[in-house]
Amino acid sequence: ISGLVYFLPPFHRNIGKRLTKSAKVFFADHGLVCYLLGIKDLAGWNNHIYKGNLWENLVFMELVKTAHLRPGANLFFYRDQNGVEIDFIVESGNTLYFLEAKAGERIDEKKLSFKKVIPLFEKRYQTKAILLQNLSEPHVLKKKGYHCINPLFADVNL
């Protein structure tokens, strides 16, 4: 449309369902979104009710930059009928990268959907789980079954 808004389609093997299911909306200009929400500084961002949504939007824009550099990579999200969601899925060949965006440094493992969703796809695809987290650590951290990356410090190379 104008380049300010992106629509992220849901992941589904059936192309028709990708087109008919509701997409997620993201904004290209993170600064404009913060301005419209009245966020004037980092403290305002850290304490904002939409901090998680803002982080997900920021992560989305980092992934869009990465995806444009990798022909054939397709970016989606996943949500089932019970509301279980994976923020982003990158399809690259026979591999699905499951990406969760979390704004906090300390994450309750129960809030991650990797264990619920990845088994649904393991027979058909190779799978990898990545937590895109607002960490102060600039390096990739390996955790139980997934990697943690702050996309502001390190490129998300898939």
Summary of predicted features, one role per range:
Residues 68-70, 116-126:
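Arginine/glycine-rich "motif VI" loop of SF2 helicases in the C-terminal RecA-like domain
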Residues 83-84, 110-118:
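A short, acidic, amphipathic alpha-helical segment used as a generic capping/interface helix at domain edges
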Residues 101-109:
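Short beta-strand-loop-alpha-helix junction that forms the active-site gateway
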Residues 135-158:
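Domain-level recognition of nuclease-like catalytic cores that cleave nucleotide substrates
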